[in-house]
From Swiss-Prot:
Residues 1-39 form a transit peptide. Keywords: Membrane, Mitochondrion, Transit peptide, Transmembrane, Transmembrane helix. Disulfide bonds: none annotated. The chain crosses the membrane at residues 50-66. It is found in: Mitochondrion membrane. The keyword Transmembrane helix applies. It is a single-pass membrane protein. Belongs to the AIM36 family. Its main location: mitochondrion. This is Altered inheritance of mitochondria protein 36, mitochondrial. Signal peptide: none annotated. One of its GO terms (cellular component) is mitochondrial membrane. The gene is AIM36. The keyword Mitochondrion applies.
Length: 243
């Protein structure tokens, strides 16, 4: 057994939910500020440039690490003072892993911020072979599962923002993480998938492509300004389908 102490700089004991939410809020605030600085909606200046993929990916790595440490600190029973060496190594290797769940072209994935699944299905002509995934519904399933390690975090978000709005306040990376976890267990090579009500921002979209799969396109309403940063970015790689 390996005791996590001052030498490793990691404490495996539980932290209070208040501290967890504070960490999450700071992280979301930082991501929000980055989005506003990087993508100023409606700006006509010719000097506006889309940040490089590497910079956005770096934000994703840092955000994922902070979110992971916050979520893993939840323990409603007694603090855990020891972890095995294997557990520690698994955590660290997981943070360094940059291999996506699906290889390029292994699955066909479309993203869409449109929330109404009926409208989304209509866009794809009610294709019976298409799999439709809503990360908000996945989050709700997790919230109602007392055995899921992320249930306490989601319950705290509901207390603060309500059941109708807490999805919009998920910590950075959680929507993509829940989607990836579901797809890993339920999807296979050759599947055609629409992840709707997603992404919430450009960072989530980049995280999705880094850790889950390269997407085919993103389907949005024409002139939709709600996720302008996402649209601007994917227009540069010709992956936007406007309707």
């Amino acid at each position: 057994m390996l005791k996590i102490g001052r030498n490793l700089g990691i404490r495996a004991g539980s932290i209070s939910r208040t501290r967890l939410l504070t960490m999450s809020n700071k992280l979301m605030l930082g991501s929000s500020c980055l989005s506003r600085r990087a993508y100023s909606a409606g700006s006509s200046s010719s000097n506006n440039e889309i940040p490089g993929f590497g910079k956005i990916a770096l934000v994703g790595v840092i955000g994922t690490y902070i979110f992971y440490k916050a979520a893993q600190s939840i323990d409603r029973n007694k603090p855990k003072e020891y972890v095995s060496e294997d557990e520690y190594n698994n955590v660290m290797s997981g943070l360094k892993r940059r291999v996506s769940i699906f290889k390029p072209d292994e699955v066909e994935i479309h993203l869409s911020p449109i929330k109404d699944v009926t409208k989304v299905k209509r866009l794809f002509r009610d294709d019976k072979q298409m799999i439709y995934i809503d990360p908000a519904k996945l989050a709700e399933q997790v919230r109602q599962d007392p055995e899921d390690p992320y249930e306490p975090l989601l319950e705290e978000l509901v207390k603060k923002h309500g059941t109708e709005a807490y999805y919009d306040h998920l910590p950075f990376g959680m929507a993509a993480m829940l989607t990836g976890r579901y797809m890993k267990e339920n999807c296979k090579a050759g599947d055609r998938i629409v992840v709707y009500n997603f992404p919430l921002n450009i960072q989530e979209a980049i995280k999705f492509e880094n850790e889950i799969s390269i997407l085919k396109d993103i389907v949005v309403y024409k002139d939709d300004q709600s996720i302008d940063g996402v649209v601007s970015y994917y227009k540069t790689v010709k992956k936007v389908q406007e309707i």
